Amino acid sequence: MGDLSLDTAVHGSEGRYHGDLSDEWEIWGPNGGYLASVALRAVAAESRFVRPASLSCHFLSGAAFGPVDLDVVHLRRAKRAESLRVTMTQTERKVLEALVWMIDTAQGLHHDYAPMPDAPTPSGLPSTEELTDEPRSKRYSFFTNVEERPTSWIDDWEHREPGEPRMASWFRFRPVATFDDLVVDACRSLILMDTLEWPAAVRAYSGQLPWVAPSLDLSVRFHRFEPDCEWLLSDTTAAIATDGLIGGAASVWSATNRLLASGGEQMLCRPVPPPA
């Protein structure tokens, strides 16, 4: 089982940082949101501000578990905001490139017209582990790091009817559920927003599919933080698939019905490799 704060930690200074990708965050290799989280930690270490405003990244090549290097440069320094670029490399191969805005918290306009999705509370829902007979050993290690309580469930997955490509689940990280550090708290949203687009997309089809679709990019806006809130709702749609791309939008909500983060990503379809 991984620990989000420990497994995204970086060390270094003056624009040069190092991290170590943990295999506890595996889904088809290191989870994309996990990679973005390590990159965000490096940016936060370099910035004089503590509040992330947005992150946009490209996944450039597959990463392996183990050491990574992160180079961070300032693109703009202003009184209340900084724009920074971070490049993650592994054995001289570029893995990820991201742009991040970090800001100083300040007074400004305030309104909230974001409607909470219609979803039951997590307290009345069973966990994925209670809903499936699949042994934990057959699941990706990523899922040991979160307790998931889906708002809907398909019992007979192999014979499912095609439906709306949407998935919503409540998640609680484990073994540690909440983090006082705003950047680590933001990492919770980053990871959840990269996790459900493929499961949402495949709900539009039945049976086994001849394609998989890794993420090309990820873009997230951090609206607010509730670091004391254990349960987060991740609501994801993959509304369109065309030209070999699957486009999705995602949002993360607190158990107090407030929007924490929003964004989306594009995934690129690739044929499923033939059996060995």
Language-model region placement:
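Terminal targeting signals and extreme-terminal segments of soluble enzymes
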Residues: 1-276
